[in-house]
UniProtKB/Swiss-Prot annotation:
PANTHER family in alphabetical order: TRANSLATION FACTOR GUF1 HOMOLOG, CHLOROPLASTIC (PTHR43512:SF4), TRANSLATION FACTOR GUF1-RELATED (PTHR43512)
Subcellular location: Cell membrane
Gene3D superfamilies tied to this protein: 3.30.70.240, Elongation factor 4, C-terminal domain, Elongation Factor G (Translational Gtpase), domain 3, P-loop containing nucleotide triphosphate hydrolases, Translation factors
Protein role: Required for accurate and efficient protein synthesis under certain stress conditions. May act as a fidelity factor of the translation reaction, by catalyzing a one-codon backward translocation of tRNAs on improperly translocated ribosomes. Back-translocation proceeds from a post-translocation (POST) complex to a pre-translocation (PRE) complex, thus giving elongation factor G a second chance to translocate the tRNAs correctly. Binds to ribosomes in a GTP-dependent manner.
Protein known as: Elongation factor 4
Family annotation (Pfam families): EFG_C (PF00679), EFG_III (PF14492), GTP_EFTU (PF00009), GTP_EFTU_D2 (PF03144), LepA_C (PF06421)
Reactions it catalyzes: GTP + H2O = GDP + phosphate + H(+)
InterPro entries: EF-4 (IPR006297), EFG_II (IPR041095), EFG_III/V (IPR035647), EFG_V-like (IPR000640), EFTu-like_2 (IPR004161), G_TR_CS (IPR031157), LepA_C_sf (IPR038363), LepA_CTD (IPR013842)
Lineage: Bacteria, Bacillati, Bacillota, Bacilli, Lactobacillales
Gene Ontology MF term list: GTP binding; GTPase activity; ribosome binding; translation elongation factor activity
Binding residues for GTP: D23, H24, G25, K26, S27, T28, N140, K141, I142, D143
Record-annotated tr-type G domain positions: 11-193
Length: 610
């Protein structure tokens, strides 16, 4: 094709993604669009087709983004090339969403006709507006008995400020309104800008590892053209590779002769090392490089840290390889080696949030067959020492000695909680118990309220989300952004077993709640740790001060069983001998700590402050 033909083809390309809150019907709508454009035959069709990970189907959530090419013949008789880029809806995967939106010109905003706008919808709409996307509102699930499309239309206009007069009323499940959506994409989403004759600039928005072909890049071509045989160069590190294959996904990979400006597809170039390709990097041609890299993504910093250790210590290298492979297409996962006296060798990993941590743990156990122990999650604290230094600490066992600490700052988040009016009291009570500060409250409509609080991230990491769902019968939706660091009265609590500190059980706690949290953990551990041949004291300590203690009683063998009557001094002698043996055993005996003990630091069900 000459450049004139390519420019004509470019005018027919439409790149868009679908954004929605969890369960508002995003994956179902994607399925219908694939059926309507006959991209997938009815034989191959299955629910949530784009959610290819088992985990995604089971949990009914989208974790990874996917990019698919479809052909659509519009009412004007022209055939258009659509690239549908599927995005996750959950707060922990906002990074994935921002990546997929950077590869688009338009976004379909799906809102449930019964539930209306949720906190997550807002967060993703703001991301789309930041990327200057054309937003097409779609009110989905209009066939539900509780649907109220007009109310939702007003919500979209009032809360988000979008013109919803032409919003498509649809039901993805019943296939209503799908054609209107496709026509709106043709009319309203702009064709990609960019120059096919300019030097190649392609944005990497994802990558997968293939055992035979190496790292396969998923790219959006912004300028120029790429074809097999080209020598490409990464703009961040200057490394060069020879392109062996380019193509598109329909969801299956299909090879093509070239990828030109506006296309979304994959590039294979025998890239062997995972570290050479960063998501957000720009690919260009080695013999005709672009002047500057594209504006990539904002690097997401992990907000939650936890230790991951293999239960079998010989699996340490397997765990490292598994983490490297996951990091390849999950750029927000960070890890570094760490050792613990209690757990041996493992990694300190950084995650975007608790769901992200859960998903990574499940993927490690499922896809790589590694049994893991996870320590309690913690956040990044700023510890200011008496020497006027500031240390960032994400691992409680690295906290400096209390005598060296001048003050500690902890991260606060701005939490947006959308909730029906009847539960506002419960939400405010929960937020206050979690040391939250009330900011403001807006009414979205007669019944729904948007409550905003500043809450310490450490409190959200624990079990805030579960508690929020249970106290609002599942009606609340929740989204948070990092806000600032604030000074707090925090202390490090150590747990001692038999007089020895167990580093993996240490945690940071607010001074006010230290005593009760210590008491609960000590009691919990007493139930979990099996009885030994000798008595084991469990203590919770802040610095040198013991704040709570409980003892696991020893198992006792009856050494007097063989004495039938007889002299009391004989019995005493046997008991003294047993006592001496226990004493010796206690001095050298170590206590086995089961996996549940590490998790008990996490779940504080019977905690009064929770």
């Amino acid at each position: 094709m000459n450049s004139q033909d390519l420019k004509k083809r470019q005018e027919k390309i439409r790149n868009f993604s679908i954004i929605a809150h969890i369960d508002h019907g995003k994956s179902t709508l994607a399925d219908r669009i694939l059926e309507k454009t006959e991209t997938v035959s009815s034989r191959e069709m299955q629910a949530q087709l784009l959610d290819s990970m088992d985990l995604e189907r089971e949990r009914g959530i989208t974790i990874k983004l996917n990019a698919i090419e479809l052909n659509y013949t519009a009412k004007d008789g022209e055939t258009y090339i659509f690239h549908l880029i599927d995005t996750p809806g959950h707060v922990d995967f906002t990074y994935e969403v921002s990546r997929s939106l950077a590869a688009c010109e338009g976004a379909i905003l799906v809102v449930d006709a019964a539930q209306g706008i949720e906190a997550q919808t807002l967060a993703n709409v703001y991301l789309a507006l930041d990327n200057d996307l054309e937003i097409l509102p779609v009110i989905n699930k209009i066939d539900l008995p509780a649907a109220d499309p007009e109310r939702v239309r007003h919500e979209v206009e009032d809360v988000i400020g979008l013109d919803a007069s032409e919003a498509v009323l649809a039901s993805a499940k019943a296939g209503i309104g799908i054609e209107e959506i496709l026509e709106q994409i043709v009319e309203k989403v702009p064709a990609p800008t960019g120059d096919v004759d300019a030097p190649l600039q392609a944005l990497i928005f994802d990558s997968v590892y293939d055992a035979y072909r190496g790292v396969i890049l998923q790219v959006r071509i912004v300028n120029g053209i790429v074809k097999p045989g080209d020598k490409i160069q990464m703009m961040s590190n200057g490394k060069t590779f020879d392109v062996t294959e380019v193509g598109i996904f329909t969801p299956k990979a299909v090879g093509r002769d070239f990828l030109a400006t506006g296309d979304v597809g994959y590039v294979a170039a025998s890239i062997k090392t995972v570290a050479d390709t960063r998501v957000g990097d720009t690919v260009t041609l080695a013999n005709n490089p672009a002047k500057e890299a594209l504006h990539g993504y904002k690097q997401m910093n992990p907000m939650v840290f936890a230790g991951i250790y293999p239960i079998e210590s010989n699996k340490y290298n397997d765990l490292r390889e598994a983490l490297e492979k996951l990091q390849l297409n999950d750029a927000s996962l960070q890890f570094e080696p760490e050792t613990s006296q209690a757990l041996g060798f493992g990694f300190r990993c950084g995650f975007l949030g608790l769901l992200h941590m859960d998903v990574i743990q499940e993927r490690l156990e499922r896809e790589f067959n590694i049994d893991l122990i996870m320590t309690a999650p913690s956040v990044v604290y700023h510890v200011h020492t008496t020497d006027e230094d500031m240390i960032e600490v994400s691992n409680p066992s690295e906290f400096p000695d209390p005598t060296r600490v001048a003050f500690i700052e902890e991260p606060y988040v701005k939490a947006q909680i959308m909730v029906p009016q009847e539960f506002v009291g419960a939400v405010m009570e929960l937020s206050q118990r979690k040391r939250g500060d009330f900011v403001t409250m807006d009414y979205i409509d007669d019944n729904r309220v948007n409550v905003i609080y500043q809450i310490p991230l450490a409190e959200i990491v624990f079990d805030f989300f579960d508690k929020l769902k249970s106290s609002t019968r599942g009606y609340a939706s929740f989204d948070y952004d990092m806000s600032e660091y604030r000074r707090s009265q925090l202390v490090k609590m150590d747990i001692l077993l038999n007089g020895d500190k167990v580093d993996a059980l240490s945690f940071i706690v607010h001074k006010e709640f230290a005593y009760e949290r210590g008491k609960i953990i000590v009691e919990k551990l007493k139930k979990i740790i099996p009885r030994q041949q000798f008595e084991v004291p469990i203590q919770a300590a802040i610095g040198q001060k013991i704040v709570a203690r409980s003892d696991i009683k020893a198992l006792r063998k009856n050494v007097l069983a063989k004495c039938y009557g007889g002299d009391v001094s004989r019995k005493r002698k046997l008991l003294e001998k047993q006592k001496a043996g226990k004493k010796r055993m206690k001095a050298i005996g170590s206590v086995e700590v089961p996996q549940e003990a590490f998790l008990s630091v996490l779940s504080m069900d019977d905690d009064t402050k929770k």
